[in-house]
Amino acid sequence: MTSQPVSQGTTPRFALLIVFLTVFIDLLGFGIVLPVMPRQAEPYLSALEVSEVAAGGIIGVLFSVFSLMQFIFSPIWGRLSDRFGRKPLLILSLLGSVVFYALYGYAVSLPFEQAQLALGLMLFSRIGAGIAGASVGTAAAVIADCTTPERRARGMALIGIAFGAGFTLGPLIAYFGLALFNERPWGVGALASLLSLVALLLAVFVFRETRVPGRTAAKEFFSMSRTVSVLRMPAVGGLILIYFLAIFSFANFEATLARFTRAAFGMADDDNFLVFAAIGAVLVVAGGLYRPLAKRYSEVSLMTAGLVQMIVGLGGLAMVSWLLFQ
């Protein structure tokens, strides 16, 4: 199947809409799995008689490995999409999400006597889902294809809105479906896999290729010398470092929030689902505000403001921990 590039006019907007829906539906599955995962991992950890500290570390790894794989593979997906087109890579990554979320559902349905296998498959599925989830990089490339440099930042805000919307509705679905997921733990992975399948069908049958034909990528797939030279550019290397630290901080926040609220305030899992949903709602609002704010303020100013708010928010959580547990 040969895809045609988008043309000028309304078609780029349609491409952006499809990318938005694709990212949103895929991240909706991520949002369903995220708050439920500690609850599903803990019985297997208890069956192995793992200490509380070690259990917290293992759950942290299950969370953080997803973001780590996204960070590593996002530029790889982007590079591959430059060579082979956006659509094939988007399809491949969404197919990976379908498979690895289904594998997660199988892992959490295993009996407690197979705790080691279950945890191993959970880890493997999170690694695979993280690699597949790096499709956000391909989505960003699509936005770059369809927008002018002046409007590119506003276009990229669509990814933030899609992420926030998925992060809001996913935990809410988990909240209202908790009783069902307790009886059928495989349902979490199955639902996430089904949602990714819907996104995959959108990518296969609705999305049109946006990479301009004739724009050839470099023959080398990877060049260490070129990578090092690019990273030495302050504008590039500095941004990548900032991005890594921000994502690393947020991933650790995601991994520890549920255990922190349980220890500090005795909050139940379903209460934490609502907390995650509230975080997602804030992400949606922030993404929506970015577009009008980008007209008045520079990208550097907005990035700085966002980082300052992250410092204040995460620092506030650290202060709460210190006050409660000193």
Put a short name on every predicted segment:
Residues T2-P12, R208-L241, A264:
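Juxtamembrane intracellular "pre-TM" segments in multi-pass secondary transporters
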Residues P35-G56, A255-D271:
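Short amphipathic helix-loop junctions that connect adjacent transmembrane helices
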Residues I72-G85, A286-E299:
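Helix-to-loop junctions at the C-terminal end of transmembrane segments
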Residues R83-L94, K295-V308:
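Cytoplasmic membrane-interface "Motif A"-like loop-to-helix N-cap segments
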Residues L95-A115, Q309-Q326:
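C-terminal ends and interior cores of transmembrane alpha-helices
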Residues L119, L123-A162:
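Cytoplasmic helix-loop-helix junction between adjacent transmembrane helices
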Residues I159-V204:
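Helix-loop-helix hairpin linking two adjacent transmembrane segments in secondary transporters
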Residues L274-K295, G313:
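Transmembrane alpha-helices of Major Facilitator/SLC transporters
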